Amino acid sequence: MLVAVALLELHIPHAQSLKDKRAVVRSVRDRLRNLDLSAKEVALQDLHQRARMAVAFVALDNAAADSVLEKVRELVESVPDAMLTGWTSEKLDFDETAPLT
């Protein structure tokens, strides 16, 4: 079992206010949640043209995690009002058969 987390940074060039930015971030977050992923803005909340978001999910194996991460990247890159300017991801492997303490 893997827990995967992606950290992404967006540039929102047409945002003239935090309200404009929030609308774009909300749109991205809702699209990601439609894929049953957890998504949250985690930094840069006071900058109206930049956003940093985290996306997290659980996958059964490495191939499934890579597939979902690719879908996340494609989805974010398809948002017309935002440009993906930064991306990093990590996968944490857990042994689901290990005894729980």
Predicted regions, residues:
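Short, charge-patterned binding micro-sites
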Residues: A39-D61
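Short amphipathic alpha-helix segments
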Residues: K19-S38
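Flexible hinge/switch segments at interdomain interfaces of large molecular machines
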Residues: M1-L2, D46
